[in-house]
């Protein structure tokens, strides 16, 4: 009973917070001048179930410690998945002229580390994602990034001590999105980056595990060549946009993931030098923070809305900003969490109370 209660708390935290395969997997290191080396895609996508490598997993509360890393174990049911799909459908049925809608669901890290002895510990991500897609309207463009991410499973794509994907993991999600959206993804081969070392994330904070403490993370963020004007908006007005910076470079330590978009702002906007007529809004939780900056390489305008905190006139904002593409990007837990689904639905009702975990 105690484990079940703790699991419900963890699922709520995972959907609500902003915030390597083994300890030998690179965690990027502290060198702030490095560029990310992206490995070429292998020809064959690896199987989901890996051979038994002798590694033993230990449950500490709702965190599964395995291969010197922390994981949450997904077990979402189809009923909640269908409710999520119905909410996405409701935006399609508003029939906003010229608005193209995408849905991208992000798997969690354990999906790519399952070994034979633990194959029944968590529900396969693709089973849950495809069940949602099956319940969605055909007009919605559905993006399952599992295969693209799996091709890179030996890279540093999820944190060791935190539930989020790294910026490299988010990059492979971005590549999946580009394939569906008819875009050319930027190559990271020559993009400079900076790194924030010494990151101990949510799993460490929940468990205080010495195993996780001895396998700390680092947070890498990319310095893209195109100039970006970054603005912070408000729920109270469609016209207020205060100029700021896309990266909160002052953060460190346990807050390092908040470098992306300054954490979980209710709404922010990025305007670029691209003049291609493509303007996108994202509805996200914190997984979207590391993902969103990549879109500045492809869109003239990117607006990011956190459904947990934004209570303004969302539909009015889409129209006022000339948005013609709408992406829902949520991790697989959030897509099966009642309060999160409720808050996405509530965006169509300005000022409605926010559901809590």
For each feature predicted by the language model, list its residue ranges.
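Bacterial N-terminal signal peptides that target proteins for export
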Residues: 1-6
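Bacterial N-terminal signal peptides
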Residues: 8-15
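Extracellular glycan-modifying ectodomains
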Residues: 19-357
């Amino acid at each position: 009973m105690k484990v079940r209660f703790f699991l419900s708390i963890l699922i709520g935290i995972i959907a609500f917070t902003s915030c390597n395969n083994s300890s030998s997997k690179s965690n990027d290191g502290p060198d702030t001048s490095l560029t990310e080396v992206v490995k070429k895609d292998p020809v064959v996508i690896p199987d989901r179930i890996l051979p038994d490598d002798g590694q033993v997993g230990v449950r500490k509360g709702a965190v599964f410690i395995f291969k010197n890393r922390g994981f949450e174990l997904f077990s979402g049911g189809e009923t909640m998945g269908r409710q999520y799909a119905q909410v996405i459908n409701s935006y399609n049925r508003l029939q906003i002229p010229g608005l193209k809608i995408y849905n991208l669901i992000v798997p969690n890290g354990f999906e790519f580390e399952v070994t034979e002895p633990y194959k029944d510990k968590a529900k396969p991500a693709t089973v849950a994602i495809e069940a949602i897609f099956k319940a969605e309207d055909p007009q919605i463009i559905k993006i399952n990034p599992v295969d693209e991410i799996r091709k890179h499973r030996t890279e540093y794509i999820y944190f060791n001590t935190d539930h989020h994907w790294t910026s490299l993991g988010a990059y492979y999600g971005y590549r999946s999105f580009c394939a569906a959206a008819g875009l050319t993804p930027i190559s990271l081969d020559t993009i400079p980056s900076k790194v924030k070392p010494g990151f101990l994330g949510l799993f460490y904070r929940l468990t205080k595990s010495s195993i996780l403490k001895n396998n700390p993370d680092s947070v890498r963020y990319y310095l893209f060549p195109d100039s970006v004007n970054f603005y912070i908006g408000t729920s109270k007005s469609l016209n207020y946009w205060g100029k700021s910076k896309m990266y909160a470079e002052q953060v460190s330590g346990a807050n390092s993931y908040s470098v992306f978009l300054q954490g979980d702002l209710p709404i922010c906007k990025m305007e670029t030098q691209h003049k291609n007529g493509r303007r996108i809004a994202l509805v996200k939780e914190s997984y979207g923070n590391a993902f969103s900056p990549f879109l500045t390489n492809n869109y003239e305008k990117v607006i990011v809305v956190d459904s947990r905190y934004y209570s303004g006139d969302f539909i009015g904002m889409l129209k006022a900003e000339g948005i013609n593409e709408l992406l829902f990007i949520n991790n697989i837990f959030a897509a099966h969490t009642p309060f999160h689904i409720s808050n996405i639905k509530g965006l169509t009702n300005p000022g409605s109370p926010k559901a809590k975990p």
